[in-house]
Amino acid sequence: MNTATGFIVLLVLATVLGGIEAGESHMRKDAMGRVRRQYCVPVDQPCSLNTQPCCDDATCTQELNENDNTVYYCRA
């Protein structure tokens, strides 16, 4: 195999591997996006007003705990 043929083979191989890697990272990005969009805080769990929403039509409500500290919980 001469130098030109070897160079072409390496170029094709790099292109194929690059395409496979790009395709996998694109799929990974889509999957992570779906996971992030579907995440919500379960009912009766602590929440934050500026983070993920509560599940099952619950709302993040302010309450006082036993030490009179303000806490937030998802309540239905």
From Swiss-Prot:
Residues 23-35 form a propeptide. This is Omega/kappa-hexatoxin-Ar1g. Its main location: secreted. It comes from the Eukaryota. Expressed by the venom gland. Disulfide bonds join 40-55, 47-60, 54-74. It comes from Atrax robustus. Residues 1-22 form the signal peptide.
